[in-house]
Every structure is written in C-alpha cells, then in structure tokens.
Amino acid sequence: MARKSLIQREKKRQKLEQKYYWIRQSLKKEISKVPSLREQWKIHGKLQSSPRNSAPIRLHRRCFLTGRPRANYRDFGLSGHILREMVHACLLPGATRSSW
C-alpha cells in the first residue's frame, strides 16, 4: 500500500493540472500561430512560469485500491497484483483466467 502522503500529493497534482489545463492549451495554440521566434519565446516563457506540477506529464496513474503506481491496467484502474487476486476470487465480471 502506498503511503497516504504520496496519494495526497498525486491528488494535489491532479487539481493543479485541471486548474491550468485551458491556460496551457491556449498558450500552446498561441505558440503555433505566432510566426516570429521572439514572440514564441515570450509565450514559451509564460508557459514555463506556470507551476511545474500543472503539466499533465507529471501525473501518475495509480491503483485505486492500493495506490500502487506501477503495473496499472487502464481498463480496470487496478494494479496487476490486485487485478490477479480479484480475478481469482471472481470479483471482476467478464474477466477470466487464461488456461491452455
């Protein structure tokens, strides 16, 4: 189980990303529209002055049960470890164990 402080930090990043999403998108569009390089640099400076954690690349997908940041399956929102346990216990409808 991930530490609670790490999970809270991730939630804080998600809020920041949502808050600055449209600002960042508008600045990116401006950069593509402006022909002069100096103007692009000025706009890029504005983009860089936004908080570091507002960038979507800083977000990490986590298991919603354990908070584990690795080996997550997007379809279920679970880590592979928990997914396997739930499939074995028949808690996920439609998911079956493979056998050959």
Curated annotation (Swiss-Prot):
Cite the entry's keywords alphabetically. Chloroplast, Plastid, Ribonucleoprotein, Ribosomal protein, RNA-binding, rRNA-binding
Q: Which GO terms describe its molecular function?
A: rRNA binding; structural constituent of ribosome
What GO terms fall under cellular component here? chloroplast; small ribosomal subunit
Which terms under GO biological process does the entry name?
translation
Q: This protein's superkingdom?
A: Eukaryota
The record's annotation in PROSITE patterns points to: RIBOSOMAL_S14
- Keyword match Phosphoprotein: no
Cellular localisation? Plastid, Chloroplast
Cite the record's note on assembly.
Answer: Part of the 30S ribosomal subunit.
What the protein does comes down to:
Binds 16S rRNA, required for the assembly of 30S particles.
Q: Which family does it belong to?
A: Belongs to the universal ribosomal protein uS14 family.
Q: What is this protein called?
A: Small ribosomal subunit protein uS14c
